[in-house]
A protein has these predicted regions:
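Non-heme Fe(II) oxygenase catalytic core, chiefly the N-lobe of the double-stranded beta-helix
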Residues: 1-131, 137-177
């Protein structure tokens, strides 16, 4: 899947940081890479980690509540080392979705420490009108922590480009376990 973020209004109150897992994986120490090879991580969506639903638009709140209640959509397993549709290898990493790796209690933190080194991270300082396109599979992003009252004024539009479930690439991902 891909995502586009477009800065609409008051976007300069917080930067977004993008971690590129492609060079992080290429330069990863052998010991850490060996711990990732063939492993899958379990992710469980937790809306409480994402946003304060009391401040959301009513339709957003309903969507978040449905995601929270729908056990099939709430949890998933994904390979740590992934290839995107273009065949580029990287790491799928998503700590905010209660990420765990069975049998390796410290791997999530070790991956975070490795992937979010300054040399793998780009900081985008937003200006209204900016558009960022990203690969959601092997690129991770996080927002700078700033005062809530500043974020309440910021408007970014998010567009998601979904992969068709009939696609051969999707079948390969599902059959890889």
């Amino acid at each position: 899947d891909g995502v586009a973020l477009q800065a609409i209004k008051n976007s300069n109150v917080a930067s977004t940081f993008y971690a590129n897992s492609v060079p992080a994986l290429k330069e990863m120490p052998e010991e850490l890479r060996a711990r990732c090879e063939g492993k899958k991580a379990h992710f469980e969506y937790d809306h409480k980690k994402w946003a304060d639903v009391s401040k959301m638009h009513p339709m957003q709140r309903i969507t978040m509540q449905f995601l929270s209640l729908n056990k099939e959509r709430r949890a998933m397993d994904m390979k740590l080392i992934q290839k995107n549709r273009k065949g580029i290898e990287g790491i799928y990493f998503h700590r905010l979705n209660n990420m765990t790796v069975e049998g390796d209690e410290t791997l999530v933190q070790d991956l975070y420490d490795w992937m979010f080194q300054d040399k793998y991270v780009y900081e985008h300082k937003w200006e209204d009108g900016d558009i960022i396109l990203m690969d959601q599979l092997i690129t991770q992003h996080k927002r700078e922590f700033v005062a809530e009252e500043l974020l309440e004024r910021r408007v970014l539009h998010r567009f998601t480009f979904m992969v068709n479930n009939d696609d051969e690439w999707v079948r390969e991902q599902q059959n890889s376990f």
